[in-house]
Amino acid sequence: MEPQTKDPDPLPRLVHIGEIQFNLGEVTTGGVTPRGTFIFCPITGGHFTTVFPLPDGFGIHSEAIEGLRAEVLPGGGDYPLIHNNELAELNVSVVAKGLNNDHIFRITSFGICEWNKLIFDMMGQTAAARSTEMGEINAWQVFRINTDSPEYAWLNWACIIGQERLIYEDSRMAKTHMKLFQFLVK
């Protein structure tokens, strides 16, 4: 067996910076396209938070004196494409408004959710349907955030990845909750 070579460059790391939750409305199924079945899932609300203080080695200047607390406003949505009833290609667009400031945060994301028995149980409303824990489903999103907030301007340049869990309430997939991680290269 050949020895593995060690990469001389430092490896990037993920640092927990916050959380986001989307409250989901009733899904509308569209037709089949060459890339998959189109559906629309309205986002009716939720919340977005960041930690404070920011982790060591963060590297982006922040004027924040507290963690962000923001409300996800109704009117956004997820516009996924479903591939072969096995995979959802996620495409989210929402707006949040700061609760501890009056600034607006435009949040977009894309990602993947591989469907497994837990998700099929939720969609079929079976007796086994339940909320998932982090890591039980292969679901992730990459976020882009735009804001006019000087305190949270660092979000405009942050490379953010979300690890997802699904919340089952009232006999349906009612919410999606994500831990947010900043991708740091040093």
UniProtKB/Swiss-Prot annotation:
Membrane-protein topology: Single-pass membrane protein
Presence of the UniProt keyword Transmembrane in the record: yes
Q: Give UniProt keywords alphabetically.
A: Membrane, Transmembrane, Transmembrane helix
UniProt keyword Phosphoprotein, yes or no: no
Q: Tell me where on the tree of life, at the top rank, the source sits.
A: Eukaryota
Kindly state one GO CC term assigned in the UniProt record.
membrane
Major location (coarse): membrane
Name the pathway. Sesquiterpene biosynthesis
Q: Which Gene3D superfamilies match?
A: 2.40.160.20
Q: Where does the record say this protein resides?
A: Membrane
Q: Membrane-spanning regions, if any?
A: 24-43
Q: What does this protein do?
A: Part of the gene cluster that mediates the biosynthesis of PR-toxin, a bicyclic sesquiterpene belonging to the eremophilane class and acting as a mycotoxin. The first step of the pathway is catalyzed by the aristolochene synthase which performs the cyclization of trans,trans-farnesyl diphosphate (FPP) to the bicyclic sesquiterpene aristolochene. Following the formation of aristolochene, the non-oxygenated aristolochene is converted to the trioxygenated intermediate eremofortin B, via 7-epi-neopetasone.
Write down what this protein is called: PR-toxin biosynthesis cluster protein 7
What species does this protein belong to?
Answer: Penicillium roqueforti (strain FM164)
- Designated gene of the protein: ORF7
